[in-house]
């Protein structure tokens, strides 16, 4: 047998596969595979993406193994060369004889969970894991009108950390619009350009867990000293510091030290600084020292581009009308769009269905209409402020104007009824009030609802708007 004749060998395999799978499955998962080389009883093939690899391993591993043995010979191995997405691990090898999960190259795992760095001694730059996700970079961040400003500012920071006026850089926007992607992209680019920089990405939740552990273990000074050695600190979901006074106080000192020593800070949040309740004023002031940039929900055109990019990276093909339909009907977040693509591919594969408009409508209808969005305090504040024609910040002031007081009390009452937050938390988020103030507000609103029909109609109107948002 001529080992270099990889094309002939793969064509033999395709003939076997054609007889064992429906045409749609063959065209989707096997036709795009390109044979590269055959040597040492190993067939190397090129596949379009990591996603492709995962589907082949999960759904077709037995078929591939049997096909290789039948068409080429017992003990034949298959090696995948993953293409398209530059962040994928190339040359993933799967020994199909031994296990459908054994790989010759083990990807470096992205550190997550509650693993904390050692605070007793700051590791050298080369030993410090930045906790960045390499799949989030500028190359695969799709730009549109809704995120153009944030993208431009982020790139400027990455090119010259702590050397621009954008320090700190505060990125905010709804869930799933790309804040975490952009924050990671900044860190990844800085590591590429400045290998000697100590870059660290950490979620606000993990920072809080680490701080609590340091208090318990009497190592708080080590915790602070470690963070003060960082050159570029990225804190994701900073709103989670709300109401946690001691964590805020510790972060305040870390922030000051880093900023005063010419280090870059990047913060993300689901809301603008002006709407961050339960946060110390001195921190809020510092959040606004540099650049505050919003990532808005993606426009229809941007959603289409995101879908095309996702489909291309995964080595898939969707009809244009399917892409248009998804983009026009799934409008909450990028994460939702990518989830729909995966759901469509899964259903297409499992049930051997063509990817067409009917399939897309079935999937989208199930996701969009069965989704019950929880009402948040932010939702309540937006609806109440709009109803009373108030600025969003007014409700958080100490104003005793009748309309402000009434709006604040109604917001507290609705938050008590529509969310799972305690009265103390509600008070922190709405005007930074205490538990007793919230109880008094709820009692006042409830009492007025019982005797005032016009007030009752007003609250019902606000509630109906809230339910529409949900």
Swiss-Prot record:
Ranges for region Domain II: 89-130
Report the principal subcellular site: cytoplasm
Q: Which InterPro entries match?
A: AAA+_ATPase, Chromosome_initiator_DnaA, Chromosome_initiator_DnaA-like, Chromosome_initiator_DnaA_CS, DnaA_C, DnaA_dom, DnaA_N_dom, DnaA_N_sf
Keyword list (alphabetical) reads: ATP-binding, Cytoplasm, DNA replication, DNA-binding, Lipid-binding, Nucleotide-binding
Gene Ontology molecular function: any one: lipid binding
Assembly notes = Oligomerizes as a right-handed, spiral filament on DNA at oriC.
Free-text function comment from the UniProt entry: Plays an essential role in the initiation and regulation of chromosomal replication. ATP-DnaA binds to the origin of replication (oriC) to initiate formation of the DNA replication initiation complex once per cell cycle. Binds the DnaA box (a 9 base pair repeat at the origin) and separates the double-stranded (ds)DNA. Forms a right-handed helical filament on oriC DNA; dsDNA binds to the exterior of the filament while single-stranded (ss)DNA is stabiized in the filament's interior.
Query: Which comment does the entry carry about domains?
Result: Domain I is involved in oligomerization and binding regulators, domain II is flexibile and of varying length in different bacteria, domain III forms the AAA+ region, while domain IV binds dsDNA.
Query: What is this protein's name?
Result: Chromosomal replication initiator protein DnaA
């Amino acid at each position: 047998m001529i080992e270099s004749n990889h094309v002939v060998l793969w064509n033999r395999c395709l003939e076997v596969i054609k007889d064992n799978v429906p045409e749609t499955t063959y065209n989707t998962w096997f036709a795009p595979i390109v044979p590269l080389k055959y040597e040492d009883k190993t067939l190397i093939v090129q596949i379009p993406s990591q996603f492709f690899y995962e589907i082949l391993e999960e759904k077709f591993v037995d078929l591939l193994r049997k096909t290789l043995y039948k068409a080429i010979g017992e003990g034949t191995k298959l090696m995948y060369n993953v293409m398209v997405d530059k962040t994928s691990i190339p040359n993933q090898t799967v020994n199909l004889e031994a296990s459908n999960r054994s790989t010759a190259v083990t990807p470096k795992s992205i550190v997550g969970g509650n693993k904390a760095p050692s605070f007793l001694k700051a590791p050298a730059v080369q030993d410090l894991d930045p906790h960045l996700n390499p799949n989030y970079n500028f190359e695969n961040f799709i730009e549109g009108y809704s995120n153009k400003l944030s993208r431009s500012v982020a790139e400027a920071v990455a090119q010259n950390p702590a050397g621009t006026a954008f320090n700190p850089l505060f990125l905010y926007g709804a869930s799933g619009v790309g804040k975490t992607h952009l924050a990671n992209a900044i860190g990844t680019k800085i590591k590429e350009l400045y290998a000697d920089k100590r870059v660290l990405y950490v979620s606000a939740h993990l920072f809080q867990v680490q701080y609590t552990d340091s208090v318990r273990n009497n190592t708080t000074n080590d915790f602070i000293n470690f963070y003060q050695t960082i050159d570029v600190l990225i804190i994701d979901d900073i709103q989670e510091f709300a109401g946690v006074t001691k964590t805020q106080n510790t972060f305040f000192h870390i922030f000051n030290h880093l900023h005063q020593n010419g280090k870059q800070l990047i913060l993300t949040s689901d809301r603008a600084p002006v709407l961050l309740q339960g946060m110390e004023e001195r921190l809020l002031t510092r959040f606004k020292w540099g650049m505050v940039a919003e990532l808005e929900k993606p426009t229809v055109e941007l959603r289409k581009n995101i879908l095309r990019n996702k489909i291309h990276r995964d080595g898939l093909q969707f009809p244009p009308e399917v892409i248009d339909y998804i983009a026009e009907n799934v409008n909450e977040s990028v994460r939702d769009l990518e989830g729909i693509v995966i759901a469509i591919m899964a259903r297409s594969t499992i049930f051997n269905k063509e990817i067409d408009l009917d399939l897309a409508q079935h999937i989208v209808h199930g996701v969009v209409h069965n989704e019950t969005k929880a009402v948040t305090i932010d939702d309540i504040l937006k609806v109440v402020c709009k109803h009373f024609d108030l600025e969003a910040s007014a409700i958080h002031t100490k104003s005793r104007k009748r309309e402000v007081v009434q709006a604040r009390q109604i917001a507290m009452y609705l938050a008590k009824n529509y969310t799972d937050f305690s009265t103390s938390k509600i008070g922190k988020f709405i005007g930074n009030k205490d538990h007793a103030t919230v109880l008094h507000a709820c009692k006042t609103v409830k009492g007025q609802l019982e005797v005032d029909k016009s007030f009752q109609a007003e609250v019902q109107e606000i509630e109906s708007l809230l339910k529409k948002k949900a």
